[in-house]
Amino acid sequence: VLDGVDSHAGLADVAGDAGMVRVVDGGEGGVEGHRQARLGGGEGGLVVIDPGPDDPEHLAALVAAIGAAKVIAITCTHTHRDHSPAAAPLAALTGAPIIGCAPLVIESDEPRVDAPFDKSYTPDRVLADSEAISGPGWTLRAVATPGHTSNHICYALEETGALFTGDHVMAWSTSVVVPPDGDMADYMASLQKLHDREDRIYYPAHGPAVEKPRQLVRGM
């Protein structure tokens, strides 16, 4: 827990070697919960990955974790409501651009099990596969991984071998793939894409770090 921050805010160090600063859980659920965000960066500022839901308690914890640091960018792996809705209010508070996955486009009138996706998500810049944002000493590159959702992307922190996997690979469970937006063929192809990479460690949106990522992916 950070000095000077209420422990009930749920702040924890997770990955200093990956340039990560904190994981924030603004409410119940712990490390596997649905109110999370990841902050990474250094002296030049930080990047917020998956800022989480637009929940006042969660947003307050996130702002407390950021403190006086400059937010360079707010990024999202996909637009489910536990990942992206806090992007807009956080952008308004910090002035940082929203950069990352594309908005979710629904091309089907079928009933949806995962209907609570974020319809309000409006990025300032969409990252295509292999495009990157960077700062002093770091490069965060998009790795397109459709399957869990059609707009899902992971982020590779190239200098460290860390991959932020969103909901494509979770440490404590297999991901949910719900049609019509989720597609199992796409999901398996994206898993193979990750297996073919040489990332050293995964940081999922839910659950702890995966220290043997290729072994986990092979088992899926």
Model-derived features: positions:
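Short amphipathic, helix-prone segments within low-complexity/disordered or flexible regions
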Residues: 4, 10, 26-29
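Short linear motifs in low-complexity or flexible loops
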Residues: 7-18, 37
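Conserved beta-strand hairpin/beta-sheet module of binuclear metal-dependent hydrolase folds
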Residues: 22-70, 154-166
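Short, intrinsically disordered, charge-balanced linker/junction segments flanking boundaries
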Residues: 33-35, 39, 213-220
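Active-site HxH/HxHxD metal-binding segment of metal-dependent hydrolases
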Residues: 45-46, 53-139, 161, 171, ...
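Metallo-beta-lactamase
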Residues: 45-48, 53-55, 112-122, 132, ...
